[in-house]
Amino acid sequence: GLYDAEGKVELFGQELNFKDTRSVLSAGVAMVSEDRKGVGLLLDRSIEDNIVFNAMQIKGEYLKKFGPFTQIDSKKIRETAEEYIKSLDIRCFGPTQHSGTLSGGNQQKVCIAKALCMSPKFLFVSEPTRGIDIGAKKLVLETLVRLNRELGMTVVIVSSELQELKSVSDRIAIVSEGKLVDILSPQAPDADYGLAMSGIKPSEHIEKGGTEE
């Protein structure tokens, strides 16, 4: 049967209300969806429009006030887009190119730029390398590591690519059938990961008569 779910999520002591997306984004949480074409990007809009979209809509950035009137700060938008295009190596003709015409890897980089433009404290990234080429995978993963180590940003990656997770993560949580089974280090044996992905905590397997190497 169904059970009532309860609990709360706090970020730096502030409780987050996930029924109010705007308040969560304003609190410093950003997400890069695995469905970049469905929900991650506005495919018929330019790269620069995509990058600043959330920051403009949620935080009111990239707008200039003239008395009772508000005007888009096109110069600042262009400068911001060019900075991200350079830092993330987005291969394009320029900031005005439509996002729908980019390769999968470059679309993913635009999604990351869009999230970073919100200056988040906490970044969720779902399947960051799905559907992109090897070179783009390397750059995307290196970018996520740099955000954590150089900017102190907390980055949570959800991925089915275990070896990729091992190469960039400090610790890896294994979830099976909706439940947290274990949290392992990247150096843990593959056998432990195999057990955890089957829903068995490695330490419990040993207690029940399994072998330890």
Describe each model-derived feature in a short phrase:
Residues G1-E213:
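Glycine-rich phosphate-binding loops of nucleotide-dependent enzymes
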